[in-house]
Amino acid sequence: MLLSDRDLRAEISAGRLGIDPFDDSLVQPSSVDVRLDCMFRVFNNTRYTHIDPAQRQDELTSAVEPTKGDPFVLHPGEFVLGSTLEIFSLPGDLAGRLEGKSSLGRLGLLTHSTAGFIDPGFSGHITLELSNVANLPITLWPGMKIGQLCILKLTSPSEHPYGSSGVGSKYQGQRGPTPSRSYQNFIRST
């Protein structure tokens, strides 16, 4: 069940759904707008010959923060990691779905490539996978609305929410754009 604006406010007021900082004006009919933080991770295209999800590649990305008051410029065909300004905390019976903003999609900005699902129990900033599919650079302003988070009520609380021992919650408590940790639980078929 997708939560309405009324249900979202009730979950936030009850302290079950955490959004910090929270701005009530960002609550939409069935989602909460999320804003862009000021930190990004750009890919170092000369450090490795290829990307291998089975290997730890610490120098694959570098942290970048634009000068205060300046935007980050995302060039055509470029892919970078960003994050939400807000920290989210979901209880064991709520999950999230991150979606892009229609107005930004119409400019050629993709907010996430594949990882739009937020597990019940997650706590932290949401990492954004930002791509420019337009033919011109796009300026990304820290604090701008970058997407919307829909909250879904599970039919029953998760038995092992994200962050529980044994679940392999690699990104619990993440701060800012967090690079891939796929190597930590990579499985190859034999």
Swiss-Prot record:
Its EC number is 3.5.4.30. DCTP binds at K101, S102, S103, L104, G105, R106, D119, T127, L128, E129, Q148, Y162, Q174. It catalyses: dCTP + 2 H2O = dUMP + NH4(+) + diphosphate. GO terms for molecular function: dCTP deaminase (dUMP-forming) activity; dCTP deaminase activity; nucleotide binding. Pfam families: DCD (PF22769). The keyword Transport does not apply. The record marks G116, F117 as: Important for bifunctional activity. Keywords: Hydrolase, Nucleotide metabolism, Nucleotide-binding. Coiled coil: none annotated. GO terms for biological process: dUMP biosynthetic process; dUTP biosynthetic process; nucleobase-containing small molecule interconversion. CDD domains: trimeric_dUTPase. Residues 161-190 are annotated as: Disordered. It comes from the Bacteria. Pathway: Pyrimidine metabolism; dUMP biosynthesis; dUMP from dCTP: step 1/1. Bifunctional enzyme that catalyzes both the deamination of dCTP to dUTP and the hydrolysis of dUTP to dUMP without releasing the toxic dUTP intermediate. Belongs to the dCTP deaminase family. Homotrimer. This is dCTP deaminase, dUMP-forming.
